[in-house]
């Protein structure tokens, strides 16, 4: 997982702006705002940003996803159920990737030029 060669995601969305970068989290693991709760249930705010894509990933135990980097694209990954082991390091380095286990109800952020991969320890 995250060895020497990385695939570049060719989906360059738009050039980054300095203003856009100021809204990014400082750390990969994102602190979520408190949910709005009433007798009907709750609404959990996740991402309050303009975006061009949203996806849902379902993966089997033991699989690897991503294992690449993006030139200008960035994304958030919210874990609905289960967990992921998220690995990341600056693109172009040989340093050992940092691993963060992200559980249900947690979210991780990936900026451009960060090698990243996810493994799934459970279905």
Show which residues each predicted segment covers.
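A short, N-terminal "cap"/entry segment at the start of jelly-roll beta-barrel domains
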Residues: 2-53
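A short, acidic/glycine-rich surface segment
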Residues: 41-42, 62-66, 94-95
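Short beta-strand His + acidic residue motifs that chelate non-heme Fe in jelly-roll/DSBH
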Residues: 43, 67, 86-87, 110, ...
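Conserved short histidine dyad/triad with adjacent acidic residue
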Residues: 55-72
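Extended, hydrophobic alpha-helical segments
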Residues: 58-60, 87-88, 96
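His/acidic/aromatic-lined binding-pocket segments of jelly-roll/cupin-type domains
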Residues: 67-68, 74-79, 100, 107-108, ...
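Glycine- and acidic-residue-biased ligand/ion/polar-headgroup-sensing regions
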Residues: 72-85, 89-90
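Short acidic-glycine-tyrosine-enriched beta hairpin
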Residues: 91-112
């Amino acid at each position: 997982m995250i060895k020497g060669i990385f695939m570049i995601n060719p989906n360059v969305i738009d050039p980054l702006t300095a203003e856009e970068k100021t809204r990014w989290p400082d750390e990969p693991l994102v602190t979520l705002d408190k949910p709005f709760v009433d007798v009907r249930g709750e609404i959990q705010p996740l991402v309050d940003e303009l975006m061009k894509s949203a996806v849902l990933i379902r993966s089997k135990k033991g699989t690897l996803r991503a294992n690449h980097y993006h030139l200008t694209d960035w994304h958030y990954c919210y874990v609905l159920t289960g967990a992921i082991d998220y690995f990341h390091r600056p693109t172009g380095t040989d340093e050992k990737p940092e691993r963060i286990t992200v559980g249900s109800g947690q979210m991780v952020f990936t900026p451009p030029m960060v090698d990243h991969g996810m493994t799934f320890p459970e279905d």
